[in-house]
Amino acid sequence: MKNILKFLLPILFLLNASNFYSHDLKGAIASDDRTPKNTLRDTYRNPYETLSFFGIESDMTIIELSPGGGWYTEILANYIHYPGTLIAAHFSADSDIGYYRRSRANFEQKISNNPMYGRVEIVDLDSSLGDLESVDAVLTFRNLHNWLGPKMDDIFSNTFAVLKPGGVFGVVEHRAKPGTSMEVMKKSGYVTEKHAIEIAKKHGFELVATSEVNANP
């Protein structure tokens, strides 16, 4: 069985069994544990509709690729609970790039300061991500433009390998106009839907659905 690819294009587009912080999805989004300034973006990022489209359930094992400052991590950590696990694939703490090291350190500090994140695991983005066929879904939000080139191939290949058969790769990205060149995509931070899907299919994914839920008005 091929793994499943779901795209949301364009964009403004754990807790143990007695986890105190676990909620249903709407409760996780409404939780006071979220950073107040992050909640202001809900109207644009549509987290309930987005995660529902990807079919995310609270007992899944999920990898979030390149979570940055943890905008979606705040929601997922509140939602995913035993026997599920949330795994954050972040920059390497030993990266030669200072921004990557600082971003990883800030993320680690964020999750260490709140018991809600007690079962969140961290792995390196440039690693194999985990054991073969070990996770139910892999998600990434507005990151593809940072990976254009060989890095995208590596990440997509590792993502396919770590997903269980029939697992979901959920992608949200800024959508470039059809025909946009690679050079412009790299400079603009926007990626054509065609290119993203082609790379995914190259690594074994099957596209099953796209959504306009995060489309600009």
What are these regions (language model features)?
Residues 25-58:
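Class I SAM-dependent methyltransferase Rossmann-like catalytic core
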Residues 58-68:
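Conserved class I S-adenosyl-L-methionine
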Residues 77-78, 153-168:
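A short glycine-rich, Lys/Arg-flanked "PGG" loop and its adjoining helix->strand segment in the class I
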Residues 87, 166-175:
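Conserved beta-strand signature within the Rossmann-like core of class I S-adenosyl-L-methionine
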Residues 99-129:
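S-adenosyl-L-methionine
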Residues 124-125, 146-159:
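A short, conserved alpha-helix within the catalytic core of class I
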Residues 128-138:
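A short acidic, Gly/Pro-enriched loop at the edge of an enzyme's catalytic core
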Residues 182-210:
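Conserved Class I S-adenosyl-L-methionine
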